[in-house]
């Protein structure tokens, strides 16, 4: 049931810190974006169980630390240690917009489900909302925690979750402006992910744990999923709402079953720290990237 489907070694010149998997349904194409400390991004097409390099984006002056693809699969966004956010057209490969943030102001990014806004997390604990069409900031939300490591939108776009360096998980109601704080971790929260049905929120932390919250009342549904031996730096929900994939500095990628609250499978194919893992839009494949400069694609269905 679980197997390694594709290995792309030396995909970048340096470690790969971020990846995302999107889909353009109108063109029947699946796109993968990887970002590296070599300052570059690569857009890949996943076709016939193989990775095809489409574009090598150049524009950042320092390492790329966060990437995302909009809901229509037409636009990619990247943020870098150079404090810039760049928007890329996935049909032409051209740079379309540039947003210059403050130093350490663009550590993480996330497209809104309607593709109109790009949320960015900053070192001050502020979440900025960037208009995709104008590349201008249109609003911000101040959180209690400092240094926003992770952002995730709920599927209907009404809420935005954030993870911060002091272990707080926040759920921002974008319609009312209220913020709910979930105190679940004692160390930095590196990644958050909503279930596709919007009922659950998963968080991953340096404390080696994954926690799952009820979005409605903030109740801790699963206090801890244990198994990783290092920081858990990435978490993502499967399309079935019942499974999670996590990546860790212990060099492993793990799949979790939420019903049994147990690890279902562990991939140990990377030779160094793994920084990001994401499900494909259909949920039948997983991508992972890490410091070994490799891209791994796994079959999970």
Curated annotation (Swiss-Prot):
UniProt entry keywords in alphabetical sequence: Repeat, WD repeat
Any single Pfam family the record assigns to this protein: WD40
GO cellular component: Cdc73/Paf1 complex
InterPro entries: G-protein_beta_WD-40_rep, SKI8, WD40/YVTN_repeat-like_dom_sf, WD40_repeat_CS, WD40_repeat_dom_sf, WD40_rpt
PROSITE patterns on file: WD_REPEATS_1, WD_REPEATS_2, WD_REPEATS_REGION
CDD domains with a match to the protein in the record: WD40
SUPFAM superfamilies: WD40 repeat-like
Membrane-spanning intervals of the chain: none
WD repeats (start-end): 11-54, 59-98, 101-140, 143-182, 184-223, 227-266, 269-300
PANTHER family per the UniProt record, alphabetical: SUPERKILLER COMPLEX PROTEIN 8, WD REPEAT-CONTAINING PROTEIN 61
Stated name of the protein: WD repeat-containing protein SL1-17
Source organism of this protein record: Schistosoma mansoni (Blood fluke)
